[in-house]
């Protein structure tokens, strides 16, 4: 399994002071990526990325995701450019709609979420390329804004989206699509069709988040996953047993990663549940990448 990147999520419920050591250990175990989360009231995504990047030497760090309504495109581009210059080639920036209820809660719910996301991604990418941006859109206005220190290596900007129109938007304006937990190989085929409808080419990145639980007792694995698959099944509008997970013993979990890779995933980011997430990561990496591979 040489073509797919294997990453790990630093879960939002884990305290921020634990991030540096977790990132260093994930890197030492051989993970390709570490992804941080930005949900209202939890940890900041850009600051979390900075912490993880500063604690490691090789690990690529993703932000999954910065909610467009909470972020000025100019300020977001400034922050991303700073990270990309200091840590070239090691950043992926995810931008999404944000949870509607949370955006209402803080008074930033847009009139048109689709317009805001498209205008934000388009302007952030242009600013990161060093362009002077003039935009009078439905949701975003930028009057001749230009970064003084754009990155020499522009980081990918990916859209964290779920619904069909948003997936088409991602194919039209983003470098890739970030796919939420619970989506399996058959979903990836549909997602690829929708991003392709928006204009995505073969280089459009597909990053998949997946709930993961590695253990030798199948009943215990199922019990550990249950509250997560139940909640996500309700969110996705599908039966719980159709919520895809990377789970089972280490070889079985590695097979789950292979299935996603065969369906087009470029990166699989494991969101471990249960005890000892780094031990689980070590086990699945050992099965996915045996020494003889």
Residue ranges and their predicted role:
Residues 1-293:
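Active-site-adjacent structural elements that line small-molecule/cofactor binding pockets in enzymes
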